[in-house]
Amino acid sequence: FRDGTLLTLLRNSVIIALLATLISTVVGTMAAVGIHSMKGRLRSAVMTITNIPMTNPDIVTGVALALLFAFAGTVLKTNSVLGFWTLLIAHITFDLPYVILNVMPKLQQMDKDLVEAALDLGCTPFQSFTKVVIHEIMPGIISGALMAFTMSLDDFVISYFVTGSSFITL
Protein backbone atom coordinates (compact mmCIF):
# COMPACT_ATOMS: atom_id res chain seq x y z
CA PHE A 1 0.00 0.00 0.00
CA ARG A 2 3.00 2.29 -0.26
CA ASP A 3 2.90 2.55 -4.05
CA GLY A 4 0.69 5.49 -5.02
CA THR A 5 0.21 4.26 -8.58
CA LEU A 6 -1.09 0.92 -7.39
CA LEU A 7 -3.51 2.62 -5.00
CA THR A 8 -4.79 4.82 -7.84
CA LEU A 9 -5.36 1.75 -10.01
CA LEU A 10 -7.14 0.00 -7.14
CA ARG A 11 -9.30 3.09 -6.57
CA ASN A 12 -10.18 3.20 -10.29
CA SER A 13 -11.12 -0.49 -10.25
CA VAL A 14 -13.34 -0.08 -7.19
CA ILE A 15 -15.01 3.04 -8.62
CA ILE A 16 -15.84 1.27 -11.88
CA ALA A 17 -17.05 -1.83 -10.03
CA LEU A 18 -19.27 0.18 -7.67
CA LEU A 19 -20.78 2.36 -10.40
CA ALA A 20 -21.34 -0.61 -12.72
CA THR A 21 -22.91 -2.54 -9.85
CA LEU A 22 -25.23 0.29 -8.89
CA ILE A 23 -26.41 0.96 -12.44
CA SER A 24 -26.68 -2.68 -13.48
CA THR A 25 -28.58 -3.55 -10.29
CA VAL A 26 -31.21 -0.87 -10.89
CA VAL A 27 -31.51 -1.51 -14.63
CA GLY A 28 -31.28 -5.29 -14.23
CA THR A 29 -33.99 -5.37 -11.56
CA MET A 30 -36.33 -3.29 -13.74
CA ALA A 31 -35.49 -5.49 -16.73
CA ALA A 32 -36.21 -8.65 -14.72
CA VAL A 33 -39.59 -7.26 -13.67
CA GLY A 34 -40.34 -6.42 -17.30
CA ILE A 35 -39.20 -9.80 -18.57
CA HIS A 36 -41.22 -11.53 -15.86
CA SER A 37 -44.39 -9.88 -17.14
CA MET A 38 -43.76 -11.05 -20.72
CA LYS A 39 -45.34 -14.19 -22.09
CA GLY A 40 -44.38 -16.93 -24.52
CA ARG A 41 -41.87 -16.52 -27.30
CA LEU A 42 -41.06 -12.90 -26.57
CA ARG A 43 -39.96 -13.79 -23.03
CA SER A 44 -37.93 -16.72 -24.34
CA ALA A 45 -36.23 -14.53 -26.97
CA VAL A 46 -35.39 -11.79 -24.47
CA MET A 47 -33.96 -14.31 -21.98
CA THR A 48 -31.83 -15.81 -24.76
CA ILE A 49 -30.48 -12.37 -25.65
CA THR A 50 -29.89 -11.68 -21.96
CA ASN A 51 -27.72 -14.78 -21.67
CA ILE A 52 -25.44 -13.90 -24.61
CA PRO A 53 -22.90 -11.87 -22.57
CA MET A 54 -22.61 -14.77 -20.13
CA THR A 55 -22.10 -17.45 -22.78
CA ASN A 56 -19.66 -15.43 -24.89
CA PRO A 57 -15.99 -15.71 -23.99
CA ASP A 58 -14.71 -12.49 -22.45
CA ILE A 59 -12.28 -11.91 -25.30
CA VAL A 60 -15.11 -11.99 -27.86
CA THR A 61 -17.14 -9.52 -25.81
CA GLY A 62 -14.10 -7.30 -25.28
CA VAL A 63 -13.15 -7.19 -28.96
CA ALA A 64 -16.77 -6.64 -30.03
CA LEU A 65 -17.21 -3.75 -27.59
CA ALA A 66 -13.84 -2.26 -28.60
CA LEU A 67 -14.91 -2.35 -32.26
CA LEU A 68 -18.27 -0.82 -31.36
CA PHE A 69 -16.62 2.00 -29.42
CA ALA A 70 -14.04 2.56 -32.19
CA PHE A 71 -16.87 2.78 -34.74
CA ALA A 72 -18.74 5.20 -32.47
CA GLY A 73 -15.58 7.30 -32.20
CA THR A 74 -15.28 7.38 -35.98
CA VAL A 75 -18.91 8.38 -36.42
CA LEU A 76 -18.70 11.04 -33.70
CA LYS A 77 -15.29 12.20 -35.00
CA THR A 78 -13.57 11.98 -31.63
CA ASN A 79 -9.95 10.90 -31.30
CA SER A 80 -9.87 9.21 -27.90
CA VAL A 81 -13.21 7.52 -27.38
CA LEU A 82 -11.84 4.79 -25.09
CA GLY A 83 -11.72 5.66 -21.41
CA PHE A 84 -13.83 5.83 -18.27
CA TRP A 85 -17.24 5.90 -19.98
CA THR A 86 -16.53 3.05 -22.37
CA LEU A 87 -15.22 0.96 -19.50
CA LEU A 88 -18.32 1.72 -17.43
CA ILE A 89 -20.66 0.85 -20.33
CA ALA A 90 -18.76 -2.39 -20.94
CA HIS A 91 -18.97 -3.40 -17.28
CA ILE A 92 -22.68 -2.61 -17.13
CA THR A 93 -23.21 -4.71 -20.26
CA PHE A 94 -21.23 -7.52 -18.67
CA ASP A 95 -23.00 -7.29 -15.28
CA LEU A 96 -26.64 -6.98 -16.38
CA PRO A 97 -27.27 -10.70 -17.06
CA TYR A 98 -26.03 -11.65 -13.60
CA VAL A 99 -28.47 -9.27 -11.94
CA ILE A 100 -31.38 -10.38 -14.13
CA LEU A 101 -30.69 -14.06 -13.54
CA ASN A 102 -30.51 -13.53 -9.77
CA VAL A 103 -33.73 -11.52 -9.58
CA MET A 104 -35.85 -13.69 -11.92
CA PRO A 105 -36.19 -16.70 -9.55
CA LYS A 106 -37.35 -14.45 -6.71
CA LEU A 107 -39.98 -12.94 -9.00
CA GLN A 108 -41.15 -16.42 -9.98
CA GLN A 109 -41.35 -17.49 -6.32
CA MET A 110 -43.31 -14.41 -5.28
CA ASP A 111 -46.99 -14.88 -4.49
CA LYS A 112 -48.90 -12.80 -7.04
CA ASP A 113 -51.75 -12.34 -4.57
CA LEU A 114 -49.54 -10.11 -2.39
CA VAL A 115 -49.59 -7.32 -4.98
CA GLU A 116 -53.35 -7.59 -5.39
CA ALA A 117 -53.81 -7.58 -1.61
CA ALA A 118 -51.73 -4.40 -1.34
CA LEU A 119 -53.83 -2.77 -4.06
CA ASP A 120 -57.04 -3.87 -2.32
CA LEU A 121 -55.78 -2.34 0.93
CA GLY A 122 -55.33 1.06 -0.66
CA CYS A 123 -51.80 1.10 -2.03
CA THR A 124 -51.15 2.74 -5.36
CA PRO A 125 -49.45 0.57 -8.00
CA PHE A 126 -46.16 2.35 -7.27
CA GLN A 127 -46.53 1.79 -3.52
CA SER A 128 -47.36 -1.88 -4.01
CA PHE A 129 -44.29 -2.23 -6.22
CA THR A 130 -41.94 -0.53 -3.78
CA LYS A 131 -43.39 -1.94 -0.56
CA VAL A 132 -44.32 -5.45 -1.69
CA VAL A 133 -42.48 -6.49 -4.84
CA ILE A 134 -39.12 -4.90 -4.02
CA HIS A 135 -39.35 -6.25 -0.47
CA GLU A 136 -40.07 -9.77 -1.73
CA ILE A 137 -37.29 -9.82 -4.33
CA MET A 138 -34.67 -8.06 -2.18
CA PRO A 139 -32.57 -11.23 -1.61
CA GLY A 140 -32.31 -11.64 -5.38
CA ILE A 141 -31.42 -7.98 -5.82
CA ILE A 142 -28.69 -8.21 -3.17
CA SER A 143 -27.24 -11.43 -4.59
CA GLY A 144 -27.34 -9.93 -8.09
CA ALA A 145 -25.54 -6.82 -6.88
CA LEU A 146 -22.88 -8.87 -5.10
CA MET A 147 -22.43 -11.03 -8.18
CA ALA A 148 -22.18 -7.95 -10.42
CA PHE A 149 -19.63 -6.32 -8.11
CA THR A 150 -17.53 -9.47 -7.95
CA MET A 151 -17.61 -10.00 -11.71
CA SER A 152 -16.85 -6.35 -12.42
CA LEU A 153 -13.95 -6.24 -9.99
CA ASP A 154 -12.58 -9.52 -11.33
CA ASP A 155 -12.85 -8.72 -15.04
CA PHE A 156 -9.58 -8.10 -16.85
CA VAL A 157 -10.05 -9.07 -20.49
CA ILE A 158 -12.97 -6.78 -21.31
CA SER A 159 -11.34 -3.94 -19.37
CA TYR A 160 -8.13 -4.41 -21.34
CA PHE A 161 -9.88 -4.00 -24.69
CA VAL A 162 -12.21 -1.09 -23.90
CA THR A 163 -9.96 1.12 -21.76
CA GLY A 164 -7.79 3.78 -23.28
CA SER A 165 -4.67 5.18 -21.72
CA SER A 166 -6.62 7.88 -19.87
CA PHE A 167 -8.22 5.54 -17.32
CA ILE A 168 -6.33 2.46 -16.15
CA THR A 169 -7.53 -0.18 -13.69
CA LEU A 170 -5.98 -3.19 -12.02
Which residues are covered by each model-predicted region?
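Membrane-water interface segments at the C-terminal ends of transmembrane alpha-helices
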Residues: 1-108, 136, 140, 144-152, ...
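Short loop immediately C-terminal to the Walker-B catalytic DE motif
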Residues: 35, 117-118
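Gly/Pro- and small hydrophobic-enriched strand-loop and loop-to-helix capping segments
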Residues: 40, 124-128, 164-167
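Hydrophobic alpha-helical transmembrane segments of polytopic membrane proteins
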Residues: 87, 168-170
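Transmembrane helix boundary and interhelical loop/hinge segments in multi-pass membrane proteins
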Residues: 106-116, 125-127, 138, 153-155, ...
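Glycine/proline-centered hinge or cleavage motifs at structural transition points of membrane proteins
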Residues: 121-122, 135
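Low-complexity, Ser/Thr/Pro-rich intrinsically disordered linker/stalk segments at domain junctions
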Residues: 131-132
